[in-house]
């Protein structure tokens, strides 16, 4: 997968394929912009392919719904990949502003340096979390959260989920707690 927005869209594609247990999926770090800046070859015609049947199990270990998050507040590490202004409720983007209780704000842009994932050492210093922690990432619609999911996986975290509904769901459900 690749895109032109520092891996935000591509990361969601990779995560989604992992959810469907696709055996071989990856993301072009730096995206199409880096590829073309390096003057690498580009095709302009549609790729021809033969359809096939992929019958793999769904990997439910990497997805979360609001129920799991709500039941585990205070027991899991919740990472909000949105901007600080979204996290603080200044930019609400839902019926309510703020964030999920106990969430840590690590803006997904901090995963990147000049459009590429930071090296493992820099990412590890950003995510100073127990490697065995149960982690859920979220944002507004699970795109930025998927980028953070991949960053965490890149540096060896095993128990990471993306909350698919993210703030778009949580912030609009008036029965869910908000800080």
What residue spans do the PLM features occupy?
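A short, small-residue-rich loop immediately preceding and capping a beta-strand
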Residues: 1-2, 134-137
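Thiolate-centered catalytic microenvironments shared by cysteine-dependent enzyme domains
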Residues: 1-68, 143-160, 166
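Anionic group-transfer/hydrolysis microenvironments
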Residues: 5, 82, 109
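Active-site neighborhoods of enzymes that stabilize oxyanions during catalysis
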Residues: 32-101, 175-179
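Short, charged, surface-exposed secondary-structure boundary motifs
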Residues: 35-38, 113-117, 170-173
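Short coil/turn segments at beta-strand junctions that form active-site/ligand-binding loops
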Residues: 74-79, 131-134, 158
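Helix-loop module immediately N-terminal to the HCX5R catalytic loop
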Residues: 104-135
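Cysteine-dependent PTP/DSP-like catalytic domain, specifically the C-terminal lobe
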Residues: 161-179
């Amino acid at each position: 997968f690749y895109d032109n927005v520092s891996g935000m869209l591509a990361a969601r594609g990779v995560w989604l394929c992992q959810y469907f247990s696709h055996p071989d999926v990856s993301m072009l770090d730096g995206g199409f912009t880096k590829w073309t800046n390096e003057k690498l070859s580009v095709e302009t015609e549609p790729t021809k392919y033969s359809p096939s049947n992929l019958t793999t199990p769904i990997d439910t270990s990497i997805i979360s719904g609001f129920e799991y998050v709500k039941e585990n507040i205070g027991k899991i590490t919740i990472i909000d990949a949105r901007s600080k202004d979204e996290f603080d409720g200044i930019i609400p983007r839902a019926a309510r502003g703020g964030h999920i209780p106990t969430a840590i704000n690590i803006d997904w842009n901090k995963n990147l340096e000049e459009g590429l994932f930071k090296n493992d050492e820099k990412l590890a210093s950003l995510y100073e979390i127990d490697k065995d922690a149960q982690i859920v990432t979220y944002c507004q619609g699970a795109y930025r959260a998927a980028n953070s999911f991949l960053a965490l996986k890149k540096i060896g975290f095993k128990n990471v989920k993306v909350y698919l509904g993210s703030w778009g769901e949580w912030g609009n459900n008036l029965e869910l707690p908000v800080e």
